[in-house]
């Protein structure tokens, strides 16, 4: 397999360590997503990229982006993945700034299905946020970008690696005291907060300072005057400082907040509205492959502290 098997490459965003393109497989005519990584620019991160590829091979859930193949061309690693045609939840937030509780509940329901599967397999995501939750035009929601995901060993209940994105990190991850799958639950709660308010807690503060605040302060909470009791309780169940006190994905999937609204067609409706909005706004077309790859190393450097909804 080589890059010539793909045509019509259009830059659609930035992923872990590199650029992400929409492309068409010449043989199957299938539209795919290509993550292209400049190995010269990421020599110290190749091990993590290899981990991502091996991790994705084993996954089999409708709510997790599918992995197809990978190959090296020159100094670039190409990873072929499922293309999600609805955009990320971060993209969809551009339409209205926030999601209604009905939409949030449906997103959470589907992400929780992915987490029930992952955690049941002894695996975790470790970087859940709106930018890593992708959608399809039919309303399907999928977890993506497992660049920092890891597999929990059967006889080991914690991990000391410092991974994730600062604003969404659980206290125990920041403190590096060891963590397990409950770190995903914290990130899920922060993501629910992000979808409801348009940005994660501490968004106006420099990421390095946030790393000091997360373990020091009480868990974030939603304003009860603005949100339903059920939603506030759902988020509260996710954002317990002690991981042992946090709910499991299985428990949260049956929470009254989820049962109140789900299942529903709200995600499909938002995706359709977003597509119409993009068309009416005449947003710039995706950037062709040839005009972007020449400075891919610079592109990677420029997005080091780009955390999506965080405003500067």
From Swiss-Prot:
One Pfam family it belongs to: Pkinase
Active site: 127
Highest taxon of the lineage: Eukaryota
Catalytic activity entry: L-seryl-[protein] + ATP = O-phospho-L-seryl-[protein] + ADP + H(+); L-threonyl-[protein] + ATP = O-phospho-L-threonyl-[protein] + ADP + H(+)
Protein's cellular compartments: Cytoplasm; Nucleus
Keyword Cytoplasm in record: yes
Repeat recorded as keyword: no
UniProt EC number: 2.7.11.1
UniProt KW keywords: ATP-binding, Cytoplasm, Kinase, Nucleotide-binding, Nucleus, Serine/threonine-protein kinase, Transferase
Domain annotation Protein kinase: ranges: 6-258
InterPro entries associated with the record: Kinase-like_dom_sf, Prot_kinase_dom, Protein_kinase_ATP_BS, STE20/SPS1-PAK
Binding-site list for ATP: 12-20, 35
Enzymatic class: transferase
SMART domains: S_TKc
Gene Ontology annotations for the cellular component aspect, listed alphabetically: cell division site; cytoplasm; cytosol; division septum; nucleus
A GO term for molecular function: ATP binding
GO BP terms, alphabetized: intracellular signal transduction; protein localization to cell division site; regulation of establishment or maintenance of bipolar cell polarity regulating cell shape; septum digestion after cytokinesis
Annotated family: Belongs to the protein kinase superfamily. Ser/Thr protein kinase family.
Protein name in the entry: Serine/threonine-protein kinase ppk11
Phylogenetic classification of the source organism: Eukaryota, Fungi, Dikarya, Ascomycota, Taphrinomycotina
Gene field: ppk11
